[in-house]
Amino acid sequence: MKLLRYGPSGQEKPGILDAAGRIRDLSAHVPDLAGDVLSDAGLARLRAIDPATLPLVSGEPRIGACVGHVGKFIGIGLNYADHAAEAGMPVPKEPVVFGKWTSSICGPNDGIDIPKGSVKTDWEVELGVVIGAKCKDVDEARALDYVAGYCVVNDVSEREWQIERGGQWDKGKGFDTFGPIGPWLVTRDEVPDPQRLDLWLEIDGHRYQNGNTRTMVFTVAQLVAYLSTCMTLQPGDVITTGTPPGVGMGVKPSPVFLKAGQTVRLGIEGLGEQLQRTRDAQ
């Protein structure tokens, strides 16, 4: 299934894409795509519904983040060896974990706000993993059983705040609008191998990132298992799993960063695309 949330910010309704790619309304069946709705049992109930029996959503509504009430938004850094190289950092021996504030979450096509005074706002196309069941101390072999599905994430990052101003990465990762998620939550039964997905990103039509999740340092299963040892993962938690090379700070001979008025387009094979315009934060 390709599940989504649509409507004005803060008033999103749950929906599903039908076979023709049209949005059907699910709000008579579930209040949101969150919590227990993301469990295997909850998704099975949605799967049993014939989309043709659901109300058709008219027009072109805003698409929100594909999961609601996110408890934890967990980032993984330097998870592609070639990205670590372009960043001038060693390939990690254990996952590099940081937090993205949930207030950074926005829809896949919402605008990206360039923070006041920022000259180093950067892009990162990433595979997002949505947890579907409470998960603590799980084995790698069973880790994917706790995944509800997958989505596209743009891990927007302000490099000066992230790297140059001391402290943790978190403060450069969590500005408002720095977490576009979606358009769809694609359930795990439709993604048989999350380590075989092409991902890409363009700025103003120029392709900067081309990668495949097979080159991850730590697989999705390894990340879920690892994170479950240091925290309890809950339904609706989102893990964004790192980016391939091609970010702005790695461009040679001189880095390239986002400015107001640009168009960011990105996508992952089978998971849909995002399209954002950049603007100065007010």
From Swiss-Prot:
This is Putative hydrolase Bcen2424_5521. The keyword 4Fe-4S does not apply. Signal peptide: none annotated. Belongs to the FAH family. Pfam families: FAA_hydrolase. One of its GO terms (biological process) is urate catabolic process. Keywords: Hydrolase, Magnesium, Metal-binding. GO terms for molecular function: hydrolase activity; metal ion binding; ureidoglycolate lyase activity. It comes from the Bacteria. Mg(2+) binds at E124, E126, D155. Its EC number is 3.-.-.-. Its cofactor is Mg(2+).
